[in-house]
């Protein structure tokens, strides 16, 4: 009876994942149509009120597209067959993340305080999902930091464990966010623009970290007073 119950539960979970994956992809097409038509309308003669309405539509579709992308990333992370393991120099992996993070904060007129351990070691990792997971954590920090704020990133490796600590200079996690911030579709309103924010990014980061032998920890930084996220993964490693 226990075995049948577990098999039924597993089957139900698989069906939910398939439905979520299909839904995410199905949303993309009508969303693209809405955005495309809104962009066409914006090029016609409009009143001030109509222009404002079009702007709201475009901003809304941009936000939804971001959520859909994160949802697709999550569903991809469930599929082991899609993962390619790559052997890279640890310094190169850190450098790739630093480069993308610098490009991200530049858009929001922020700065990065970057610290990374020096190592000639090579690591074998699921590069793409791990890279996206770390960038989701950094994106979350960016969204909760005001212009001219600083994002602190500490990247290190020890005992076959890759760890990234990201601290922002925002208002920090609420009590509710500390408890539920990595849950799918968790919402808070502490983002930089004051709008409700969905926690898909941290949910995806947690999903990937746990899949590769690691985890994620949420806290508030003693240094900045902002949010602190520690994400880590296990990796096989060899000296060069």
PLM feature spans:
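Short alpha-helical segment of the dimerization/phosphotransfer core of two-component systems
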Residues: 59-64
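Conserved micro-motifs of the catalytic ATP-binding
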Residues: 79-84, 122-125
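Acidic ATP/Mg2+-coordinating residue in the GHKL
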Residues: 168
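Conserved catalytic submotifs in the C-terminal HATPase_c
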Residues: 86, 106, 111-122
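Short conserved segment of the HATPase_c
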Residues: 173-186
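Conserved glycine-rich
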Residues: 214-215
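Short helix-loop "hinge" at the ATP-lid/N-box region of the Bergerat-fold HATPase_c
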Residues: 141-142
């Amino acid at each position: 009876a226990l075995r049948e119950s577990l098999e039924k539960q597993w089957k139900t979970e698989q069906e939910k994942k398939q439905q979520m994956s299909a839904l995410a992809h199905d949303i993309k097409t009508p969303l693209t149509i809405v955005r495309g038509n809104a962009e066409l309308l914006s090029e016609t003669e409009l009143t001030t009120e109509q222009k404002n309405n079009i702007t709201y539509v475009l901003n809304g579709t941009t936000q939804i597209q971001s959520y859909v992308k994160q949802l697709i990333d999550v569903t991809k992370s469930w599929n082991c067959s899609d993962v390619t393991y790559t052997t890279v120099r640890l310094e190169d992996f850190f450098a790739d993340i630093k480069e993308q993070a610098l490009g991200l904060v530049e858009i929001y007129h922020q700065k990065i305080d970057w610290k990374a351990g020096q190592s000639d070691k090579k690591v074998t990792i699921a590069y793409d999902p791990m890279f996206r997971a770390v960038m989701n954590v950094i994106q979350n920090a960016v969204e909760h930091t005001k212009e001219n704020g600083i994002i602190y990133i500490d990247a290190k490796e020890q005992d076959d464990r890759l760890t990234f600590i990201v601290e922002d200079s925002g208002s920090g996690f609420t009590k509710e966010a500390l408890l539920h911030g990595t849950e799918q579709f968790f919402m808070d309103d502490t983002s930089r623009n004051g709008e409700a924010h969905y926690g898909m990014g941290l949910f995806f980061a947690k999903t990937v970290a746990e899949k590769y032998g690691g985890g994620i920890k949420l806290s508030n930084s003693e240094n900045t007073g902002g949010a602190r996220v520690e994400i880590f993964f296990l990796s096989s490693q060899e000296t060069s």
